[in-house]
Amino acid sequence: MDSSAQVIIANLTSPPVLAFALGLLAVLVKGDLRLPDPIYQGLSIYLLLGIGIKGGVSLRQSELSDVAIPALATIILGLLIPVLAFFFTGKLTKLSEVDRGALAAHYGSTSLVTFTAALVFLEQSSIQYEGFVTTLLALLEIPGIIVGLMLGSRHLKRDVSWGESLQEIFSSRSILLLVGGLVLGFATGTVGYAKIEPFFGALFIGMLTLFLLEMGTLAGRRMRDVKSAGAGLIVFAIAFPIGSGILGVVFGYASGLSMGGAAVLGVLAASASYIAAPAAVRLALPEANPGIYLAASLGITFPFNLTIGIPLIVLVAQSLEGMVG
């Protein structure tokens, strides 16, 4: 068996991905594996805070010069991807500008769970990556949403409530916990983190597995909307993440990241938001159809990235490493 197949099979047979598949299967057979909402909310808080804290600890150990250029590259990527998404949805679909802007906001932002699954995959594959990649996640979360909202609202005959929308973005649970975790981790350092490592370290993959079981049921319910999404949108929701993922890898190498770091930036670029972006879109672009942007981001792109996209982007990063090395 060649190395490419081994990489993909290793991802498909990992406990978190298998739990996600179980959640999907439960929806297909009309079973009930939904977690109680308080448990789901608790798991999301745990993952966001844990990722933030670990990223903050690593950021404290990094030099500013090591972080600055990748951070700038990430911001540029965050501004570019929603513009590309808006353009390609115009070529592949007959959607309105409002719906295309909503999609651009989702694909310009990031998915924490896809990011987390990528880190777990890299660690299980013994691939090293820069510890400050969580900072890149935080930087990529917001610009894409703002650009997407701007593109989608250009020709509306009403004023967009930007103040309320920006407040929703910056005060969202995902941003507060992620940035708050970064600050906590940076402040406490390795000594402080050692005291909480048994909770945020040893239990992490188990918690992620439970969370992805629930995400499988959510994605399964959104897949019902895929049938009405149209062929063009389905093509976009699979092909665009591949293209933006490769672009992210290229930006990663250009900014000086290692192979693992470039792969992480590629996964971030390929992912689509289903937490922060939907909340902002509901406020700024209420005319946009949730059945379109949630079917694409959660029903198609998220399962694709989780199963095929992550190992595919890692393989791309490994292939390009020889060219830039």
PLM regions: where:
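Long, repeat-rich segments with strong aromatic
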Residues: L218-A231, A237-P241
